[in-house]
């Protein structure tokens, strides 16, 4: 059967340039990619996202996961996650699910557990609204929450950040699409307090321009 054969794919959902609207927000480059190898039922999955500022990797998140199909539209995933930022690097054991929710919302959610009782919950949801067969509007929401304060990395217990954005892309083909958009990010709770103490913005708005492609 075809489902028993191994396949692979690499997708860059976001490869973009982002520019802040206020004078205290600089421009950055951002990426969000995923690669997998395996069958329809079992596969190795690598997820990578990050941000570059002044030609330097400012922060990154990399996950190496094993995925198992729970149903036609949902995969269960387990593996390791590695975070790096201005503070100490963090390592996690990650459990998650990824798939299509009712009404065709793309959902990627995970719970990660680290040393010293650290935990983090992440939720990302996207939806594609077809204006035409090639012009697509994509709202996106990302939520992060932590189980305890991590002062060295500037994140606090509870709801840490909420990002909402909308991107309009034009698909020259199913494999290549440039886009424009805008994104709003807010920090909350202790994370907002840590940001203010460090002289960083708690709310920010950015215009984004990039490409989405896969092979």
Describe the role of every protein-language-model region.
Residues 37-39, 68, 99, 113, ...:
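Residue-level signature of outer-membrane beta-barrel architecture
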Residues 1-56, 60, 68, 189, ...:
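Outer-membrane beta-barrel initiation region
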Residues 14, 46-50, 78-82, 109-113, ...:
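Transmembrane beta-barrel strands of outer-membrane/channel proteins
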Residues 6, 27-31, 58-62, 89-93, ...:
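Residues that define the transmembrane beta-barrel architecture of outer-membrane proteins
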Residues 89-150:
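Detector for outer-membrane/organellar transmembrane beta-barrel domains
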Residues 40-46, 72-76, 103-107, 132-137, ...:
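Repeated loop/turn-to-beta-strand initiation elements of outer-membrane beta-barrel proteins
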Residues 166, 171, 201-215:
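Outer-membrane beta-barrel "beta-signal"
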């Amino acid at each position: 059967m075809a489902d028993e054969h191994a396949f692979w794919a690499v997708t860059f959902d976001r490869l973009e340039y982002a520019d802040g609207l206020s004078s205290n927000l600089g421009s950055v480059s951002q990426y969000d990619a995923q690669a997998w190898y395996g069958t329809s039922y079992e596969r190795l999955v690598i997820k990578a996202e990050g941000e570059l500022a002044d030609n330097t990797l400012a922060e990154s998140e990399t996950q190496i996961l094993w995925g198992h199909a729970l149903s036609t539209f949902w995969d269960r995933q387990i593996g390791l996650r590695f975070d790096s930022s201005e503070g100490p690097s963090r390592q996690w054991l990650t459990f998650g699910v990824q798939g299509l929710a009712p009404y065709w919302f793309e959902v990627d959610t995970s719970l990660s557990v680290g040393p010293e009782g650290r935990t983090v919950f992440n939720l990302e949801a996207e939806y594609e609204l077809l204006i035409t067969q090639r012009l697509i509007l994509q709202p996106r929401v990302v939520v992060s929450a932590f189980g305890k304060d991590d002062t060295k990395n500037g994140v606090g217990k509870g709801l840490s950040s909420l990002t909402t954005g909308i991107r309009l892309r034009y698909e020259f083909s199913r494999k290549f699409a440039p886009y424009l958009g805008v994104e709003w990010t807010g920090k909350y709770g202790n994370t907002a307090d840590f940001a203010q103490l460090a002289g960083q913005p708690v709310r920010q708005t950015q215009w984004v321009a990039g490409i989405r492609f896969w092979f």
